């Protein structure tokens, strides 16, 4: 089977929604997913790539990344989401998506790509380590909901 990576389009929202539900367990409404995707696609600081099956263009995974600028280290790109449809995991699609963000980071002169992965996503941690990422630290993820 052959695959290709391209930048996401608003018409990809339904497949991104399906992948979020099936692979990540995020029950976020389709209408909201579409609205968020439209906003994200309009920002020059963000990129969303999808990996598609060559034979029919089916979106099988996606990666969302954005600029990461802090006052205590050089410029990076931050992976905010990487998910592959469970039916297509283990065939290299995640690696294709990582290649896309890493190329973008190099083109922008960034020194690194970073991400935060949930504590319970052990298989994801092994995947990232296999792709050359390293564990830097463990941290707590805090949130204060405003509404």
Residue ranges of predicted features:
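Acetyl-CoA-dependent GNAT
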Residues: 3, 7-11, 18-75, 80, ...
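Terminal substrate-recognition subdomain of acyl/acetyltransferases
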Residues: 103, 134, 140-147
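Conserved GNAT acetyl-CoA-binding A-motif
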Residues: 98, 105-117
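Conserved acetyl-CoA-binding loop-helix of GNAT-fold acetyltransferases
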Residues: 84, 90-103, 126, 130
């Amino acid at each position: 089977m052959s695959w290709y990576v391209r930048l996401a389009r608003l018409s990809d929202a339904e497949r991104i929604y399906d992948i979020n539900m099936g692979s990540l367990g995020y029950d976020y409404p389709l209408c909201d997913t579409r609205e968020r995707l439209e906003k994200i696609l309009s920002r020059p600081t963000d990129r969303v790539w999808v990996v598609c099956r060559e034979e029919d263009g089916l979106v099988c995974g996606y990666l969302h990344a954005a600029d990461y600028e802090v006052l205590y280290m050089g410029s990076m790109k931050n992976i905010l989401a990487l998910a592959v449809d469970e039916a297509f995991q283990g065939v290299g699609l995640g690696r294709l998506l990582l290649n896309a963000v890493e190329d973008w980071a190099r083109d922008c002169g960034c020194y690194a790509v970073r991400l935060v992965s949930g504590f319970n996503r052990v298989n994801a941690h092994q995947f990232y380590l296999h792709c050359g990422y390293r564990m830097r630290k463990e941290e707590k993820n805090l949130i204060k909901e405003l509404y």
